Structure formats: C-alpha cells, structure tokens
C-alpha cells in the first residue's frame, strides 16, 4: 500500500538474483512480465544478439565472444561500444504494466567483471560441482536446476504390489509412506 498515493504514476522495482528453478520469486515475477533482454550489436556485422554463455570462447588465456550472425570472435574491448548501442527487446506479450529485465554478468562494463574472469569461475565449477549453483545464479542470472538421479514415475509404478487394506506385508516391522510433489 506504500505506493497507493501515486496511483498510476507508481513504479515498483523487484530486483534480485534468481535462485532455484520453480522456487525463485524473481523467476516467477519475470515469467509474468514481458521478458526483456538486452541486445547488443556485433562490431563486425552489426547483428543484434543477447550475450549468451554458450558463445563465450576461451583462447590463449583470454575470453572472446563468438557472434551468432557472422561467427567472428569479438574481443572484450568492444563491449563498451556494444553496450552503448544496444537496446532492450521484449520477448513475451505485455500487459502494458509489467516490464521484466534480465541481465547477466556477461554485460558487466569493461573494468568490472570480465569474460575471462567468468571463464575462470566456470572452470572452478568443473573441479567443484557444488559451485555450479552460484555460477548459474550470480554470473548467468539464471535459476539453478539440480540434476536428479530419481527414477521416472513409471518405473516406480511398475514395482507396486497390492495388499488388502489394513494389512502389513509379511516380514514388515512398520509401514511408512511419503510423497514428494
């Protein structure tokens, strides 16, 4: 109710780092928005694109960005120019009231967190997978989804057995049940 005074002129900002997929409050709010991403132009071909982790290339103790349009490798020294000439692009229908913005650390200005530093942090996750969660959340600005080795529900269903209600199977000491939804 703090913004009620401002009626239609109010602006509410929800700013956060995403956490666990399906549980993250900021992910839920972003999904309800028009999902804007910042597109930057390639300094070689001018094609606009999101800065995506999949396009980072580590070479000779350096990190470069491969353009999705022309395939040329872009040095980080072009980033200032790219950021200055970029624009926000909505990717979902808008309700006219809610704008959502996603920006990863790959957009950090020159002199801040570099692409090479992002690669170095990523390399540490290969040696210590427990760091993957933090890398996805804080560097990529994405939710983390843990890999699971749980069997498919059909495999569990095939193992079921039928017993009359009120009976415990022979050899059973106690009966317990659990459900994870």
Predicted features along the sequence, with ranges:
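Short, flexible loop motifs at catalytic/binding sites
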Residues: 1-181
């Amino acid at each position: 109710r703090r913004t009620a005074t401002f009626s239609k002129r109010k602006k509410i900002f929800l700013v956060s780092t995403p956490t666990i997929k399906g549980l993250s409050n900021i992910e839920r709010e972003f999904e309800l928005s028009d999902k804007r991403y910042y597109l930057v132009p390639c300094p070689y071909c001018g094609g606009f694109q999101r800065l995506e982790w999949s396009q980072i290339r580590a070479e000779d103790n350096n990190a470069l960005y491969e353009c999705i349009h022309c395939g040329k490798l872009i040095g980080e020294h072009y980033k200032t120019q790219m950021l200055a000439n970029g624009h926000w692009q909505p990717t979902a229908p808008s309700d006219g009231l809610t704008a959502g913005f996603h920006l990863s650390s790959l957009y950090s200005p020159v002199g801040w967190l570099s692409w090479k530093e992002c690669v170095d942090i990523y390399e540490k996750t290969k040696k210590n997978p427990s760091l993957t969660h933090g890398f996805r959340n804080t560097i990529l600005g994405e939710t983390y989804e843990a890999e699971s080795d749980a069997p498919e529900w059909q495999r569990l269903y095939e193992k079921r057995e039928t017993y009359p209600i009120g009976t415990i199977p022979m050899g059973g000491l106690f009966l317990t049940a659990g459900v994870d939804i």
